[in-house]
Amino acid sequence: MARRKKIYEGKAKILYEGPEPGTIVQYFKDDATAFNAEKRATIDGKGVLNNRLSEFFMTGLNGIGVPTHFIKRLNMREQLVRAVEIIPIEIVVRNTAAGSISKRLGIPEGTALPRPIVEFYYKDDDLGDPIVSEEHIIAFQWASQQDLDDMVALALRVNDFMSGVMLSVGIKLVDFKIEVGRVFEGDYQRLIVADEISPDSCRLWDIKTGEKLDKDVFRRDLGNLADAYTEVAQRLGVLPKNATPMTKPTLIN
């Protein structure tokens, strides 16, 4: 088989040219990073779990009419997705105060926010993905006003879907991050959800105990990250309840 051409490698995924024009193969790695990659580890099985979970969420969104780049899962670590022109903005939706909003605004972690709050972050690792306003986005032409309106609408629909799905299995969706890309169909452009949706990009807390089931387990050294992700996958029915536990993380020197 011919060697595939690598398009891009990020912290958690590798993108390869797809088998058909306009497609990409997205490969999920076992690497975990935090604090702008200052903290690193290899977590056996993490890529498999995120591939399956992102497939689950993207398929669900497609099913309710929220367009995503997901086409199909190819194997345990890879999925076929549509090629998109990524807008260089991360969209964060917050339902409960945690992480940077608690630090910035002095809101105690766990405080329910009066409504979902949408934030924008400029995608630039060298700058630490700084928070930006709509004015910045339009002034620097990262996206148009219409794009922004569509991005917010997409993000809030994702929030409604994800909140309901998680609530049904006893998990609170604290916040999440998505990326959005442009696809061109004839003379028309539309925006679709891209990248991934997984515990890497969400904060997930057990409703009863407050136990963290997301990447904060790794950030804060709260336990075994693969066990937390496996718990989410099992509750959602993505993995059977008797799935083999993942091995413990191995730190990279």
Swiss-Prot record:
GO terms for cellular component: cytosol. The keyword Nucleotide-binding applies. It is an enzyme of class 6 (ligase). Its EC number is 6.3.2.6. One of its GO terms (biological process) is 'de novo' IMP biosynthetic process. GO terms for molecular function: ATP binding; phosphoribosylaminoimidazolesuccinocarboxamide synthase activity. It catalyses: 5-amino-1-(5-phospho-D-ribosyl)imidazole-4-carboxylate + L-aspartate + ATP = (2S)-2-[5-amino-1-(5-phospho-beta-D-ribosyl)imidazole-4-carboxamido]succinate + ADP + phosphate + 2 H(+). Pathway: Purine metabolism; IMP biosynthesis via de novo pathway; 5-amino-1-(5-phospho-D-ribosyl)imidazole-4-carboxamide from 5-amino-1-(5-phospho-D-ribosyl)imidazole-4-carboxylate: step 1/2. Keywords: ATP-binding, Ligase, Nucleotide-binding, Purine biosynthesis. PROSITE patterns: SAICAR_SYNTHETASE_1. It comes from the Bacteria. Pfam families: SAICAR_synt (PF01259). InterPro entries: SAICAR_synt/ADE2_N, SAICAR_synt_PurC, SAICAR_synth, SAICAR_synthetase, SAICAR_synthetase_CS. Belongs to the SAICAR synthetase family. This is Phosphoribosylaminoimidazole-succinocarboxamide synthase. It comes from Dinoroseobacter shibae (strain DSM 16493 / NCIMB 14021 / DFL 12).
